[in-house]
Design a protein with these regions (language model features):
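The feature captures the beta-strand-to-loop junction immediately N-terminal to the Walker
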Residues: 36-38
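Short helical segment in ABC ATPase nucleotide-binding domains corresponding to the A-loop/adjacent helical element
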Residues: 91-101, 109, 217
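Conserved ABC transporter NBD signature motif
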Residues: 59-71, 111
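Conserved signature/switch motifs of ABC ATPase nucleotide-binding domains
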Residues: 127-130, 148
């Protein structure tokens, strides 16, 4: 079976700065892949290229055998920052992708309500973003991305602005939602434990130029609960990935101080 998402010899430069170099990836349908690496290794740039929001300088991205040349409804994007429209209700924010596509009927409205229930927001349909906590707003962002029924879900550090406790709750909620539909997910994070908890594979990026250092298969049983983070096997995965990026992380910290 052909890969759902095929990335071949992907490169990206900004003037003289080479941000990404020769990234190759074959992603299967229903696979959950996380991307980790030090600051400045091009993780977000990589995700934006896959989303069609940023052109590649070299190489190609194919989804179901078709070249990605721009944004499309076959990809849903959950951003790091909260970008809900403050004057729209939870329901109106969640269904906006369907409105843009000109496809809003009874079926789409029912599906949006089902998704809000799936992400734990049943009863909050008529609330506005200012009335919601950070975790609840990210649930709306997730429902909005799922409402267009994307083939691939792209997530750029969606829980980074949340406190530690809320972040762990959102990780378990994302796992529950993913298990229910098995979307193909590409998830960028700085948190190694988050990557190991969520993913089937973790792509470890090296810095400048950003390149794939290692693809780590995570052979932990599913479904996963937070208790798995206390197991020796989980800790071994986290330690292995940390050792892969430790030197680059230290170099990034020193560079930021200069």
């Amino acid at each position: 079976m052909a890969p759902k998402l095929q990335i071949s010899h992907l490169g990206k430069s900004f003037g003289e700065l080479q941000a990404l170099h020769d990234i190759n990836l074959a992603m299967e349908r229903g696979e959950f892949i996380a991307v980790v690496g030090p600051s400045g290794c091009g993780k977000t740039t990589f995700l934006r290229i896959v989303a069609g929001l940023e052109p590649a300088s070299s190489g190609e991205v194919e989804l179901d055998g078709r070249a990605v040349t721009g944004p499309g409804g076959d990809r849903g994007f959950v951003f790091q920052t909260d970008n809900l429209l403050p004057w729209r209700t939870v329901f109106a924010n969640a269904i906006i992708g369907r409105e843009v596509a000109g496809r809003v009927g009874p079926a789409e409205r029912r599906r949006t309500l089902e998704l809000l229930k799936l992400v734990g927001l049943e009863g909050f349909e008529n609330y506005h973003p200012r009335q919601l906590s950070g975790g609840m707003r990210q649930r709306v962002n997730l429902a909005r991305a799922l409402a267009i029924d994307p083939q691939v879900l792209l997530m750029d550090e969606p829980f980074s602005s949340l406190d530690a406790q809320t972040r762990e709750i959102m990780q378990t909620e994302l796992m529950r939602i993913w298990e229910a539909g098995r979307k193909t997910v590409l998830f960028v994070t700085h948190q190694i434990d988050e990557a190991v908890f969520l993913a089937d594979r973790v792509l470890v990026f090296a810095r400048r130029p950003g390149r794939l250092r290692e693809s780590v298969a995570i052979a932990l049983p599913r479904p996963r609960t937070l208790a798995i983070k206390r197991t020796a096997e989980f800790v071994r995965y986290v330690d292995h990935i940390w050792r892969l990026i430790e030197d680059d992380v230290r170099a990034s910290v020193i560079e930021e101080k200069v």
